[in-house]
Amino acid sequence: MSLPEHLGGHKNITHLDEGALDHMIRILNVKSMLDIGCGPGGMVGLASSKGLEAYGIDGDFTVERNKDIENSIIIHDYEKGPSKFDKEVDLVWSVEFLEHVWEKYQDNYMKDFQRGKFVIVTYAPVGKAGHHHVNCNTQEYWIDVFKKYGFSYDANMTRMIREASTMGRMKSNKTTGKKFWWKDFVKQNGLCFVKL
């Protein structure tokens, strides 16, 4: 069976963010995590290596995942309905996921976000090109969506997580020599929410 077009945008790459995860462990005593849209599962593996009970959900059934975490990953396509994930966790992590799922399927994945006390997500702004980007939106839009599902946006925690983020790398423009962060999704568009 071939992979549906709307899945697999991760290209077998996990965008790790040890800085943000360490901050959540240190400041909020996070002991468990769910990564929604985990791709190959790198953040699940990183969290597990730090002693967290870690899980992931991703729709791509073609990815070869590390044997150490494969039993912690649920293969699920949110276009088919809610997942069967049934645990409560301290942190729900979701990087480069929201913009890939049609708005009409929000109820399906928000049930899993509601399993966390804290949420860290990234979003793609309006007009951001990418594989199956079908719900690129503003920060305000996502704050309203999470509020509707029982979360409060935490501006202070968002600032701290963006500062703590180690995702991405510094690159230089070949023409101007100007340095910039590349693939720094959390620094640019990370948002933090607390369950009410």
Label each region the model flagged.
Residues 1-95, 104-114, 129, 135-141, ...:
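Conserved N-terminal segment of class I S-adenosyl-L-methionine
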Residues 100-101:
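A short His-aromatic
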Residues 116-127:
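Conserved beta-strand signature within the Rossmann-like core of class I S-adenosyl-L-methionine
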